[in-house]
């Protein structure tokens, strides 16, 4: 049996209003990556291959975990949430988020609009689901342990695919995924 270990990046700038503003670890995010790395190296290694998305927060997390030799795979990049919400606001589909607490209601509404084709963002929803399915299929190697440092939307989509869940359930999975949390998928031949 193989195993895919999905890790969400460390804490990023949650007060950001743009993708670029969010895409950096906070001091705590760097510490979280280091703590998880110490634990993984002591209790959970080794891995046959290590991958990370190309986003700065993902790259900083995998490096902070002590994996200098990893492969960058942009298919592990997060949903471009800020781009999607900007498009929703421009089309009058939702009110502007006033605080980080609004995320719990705004995120599911954004995903629904995206899936329904009311907004496209930088990629269509169908392209997003295909890229997540593709990277998980490639990582699913019987007898191999693969580590992927990614983001909450990717983890939620992977779980939703495995469990055949709809977009509303995917949103429920995504919301509580914590920074540097570990999610395992067992791979059977």
Pin down the residues of each PLM region:
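Generic beta-sheet signal
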Residues: 4, 144-150
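Short beta-strand scaffold positions
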Residues: 52-53, 130, 149-150
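Phosphate-handling substructures
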Residues: 66-131
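Glycine-rich phosphate-binding loop signature in dinucleotide/nucleotide-binding domains
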Residues: 43-46, 139-144
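GST superfamily/GST-like fold recognition
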Residues: 152-156
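Domain-level recognition of soluble alpha/beta enzyme cores
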Residues: 166-188
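Short aromatic-enriched loop/helix-cap "lid" or pocket-rim segments at secondary-structure transitions
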Residues: 16-19, 63, 81-86, 160-161
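Active-site-proximal alpha-helix that buttresses catalytic centers in soluble enzyme cores
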Residues: 2-73, 126
């Amino acid at each position: 049996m193989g195993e895919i270990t999905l890790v969400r990046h460390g804490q990023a700038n949650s007060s950001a209003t743009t993708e670029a503003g969010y895409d950096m670890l906070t001091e705590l995010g760097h510490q979280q990556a280091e703590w998880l790395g110490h634990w993984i190296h002591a209790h959970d290694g080794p891995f046959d291959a290590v991958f990370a998305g190309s986003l700065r927060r993902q790259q900083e997390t995998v490096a902070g975990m002590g994996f200098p030799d990893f492969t960058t795979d942009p298919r592990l990049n997060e949903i471009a949430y800020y781009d999607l919400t900007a498009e929703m606001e421009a089309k009058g589909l939702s009110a502007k988020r006033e605080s980080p607490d609004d995320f719990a209601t705004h995120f599911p509404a954004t995903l629904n609009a995206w899936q329904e084709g009311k907004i496209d963002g930088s990629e269509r929803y169908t392209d997003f689901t295909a890229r997540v399915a593709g990277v998980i299929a490639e990582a699913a190697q019987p007898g191999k342990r693969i580590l992927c440092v990614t983001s909450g939307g990717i983890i939620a989509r992977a779980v939703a695919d495995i469990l055949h869940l709809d977009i509303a359930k995917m949103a429920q999975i995504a919301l509580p995924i914590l920074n540097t949390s570990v999610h395992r998928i067992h791979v059977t031949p």
